[in-house]
Design a protein with these regions (language model features):
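Membrane-anchoring hydrophobic helices of lipid-metabolizing enzymes
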Residues: 2-14, 18, 22-103
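Soluble catalytic domains of membrane acyltransferases
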Residues: 84-162
């Protein structure tokens, strides 16, 4: 979704700038192409800059008991965008087996650091409580967002905490 918005915005700005520059010759056709790529990269950088600014507004020392829907939504759409940019091909089967009328616990075995991003995006409509290692809560941009989305911190090295 976000990728399509960025592409549409970049295309609209490219067309507008090309129209204002009055590009009419075929030998100048490279200008809109370079403009489109530059504007697209600029829009993505602007998005992450805004995300960074929003992360500064979150009090990481405070304990939250309910996740904020806005910040949880930002986490989900950013995960979607990262999955799309990584060109991750995901085939999901068995979603109908996930219970909808009772509480349950899912334990994911992941081989890479990217797997939880995809898993969280795929199960975004489920009312899940996510767990994460304590070092993820200290990450500069993602840390405040996962804290405000009420992820649980579990130290895997300490058996008593796990």
């Amino acid at each position: 979704m976000l990728k399509k918005i960025f592409l549409g915005l970049s295309l609209a700005l490219t067309v507008l700038i090309s129209f204002l520059m009055k590009i009419t010759l075929w030998k100048e056709i490279w200008i809109p192409i370079v403009l489109f790529i530059g504007i697209y990269i600029g829009v993505v950088i602007l998005y992450f800059f805004i995300i960074w600014l929003l992360s500064l507004t979150i009090d990481t020392k405070k304990e939250y008991d309910k996740p904020n829907k806005f910040y949880a939504w930002l986490v989900v759409i950013t995960m979607e965008m990262l999955s799309n940019y990584a060109r991750a091909k995901v085939k999901v089967t068995g979603m109908e087996k996930i219970p909808t009328n009772q509480k349950y616990m899912l334990v994911f075995n992941h081989r890479s650091k990217f797997d939880p991003i995809i898993q969280s995006y795929i199960l975004r409509k489920s009312n899940l409580v996510h767990i994460s290692k304590p070092s993820n809560f200290k990450a500069p941009i993602a840390g405040p967002f996962i804290k405000r989305s009420c992820y649980l911190s579990i130290d895997r090295d300490n058996a008593r905490n796990g």
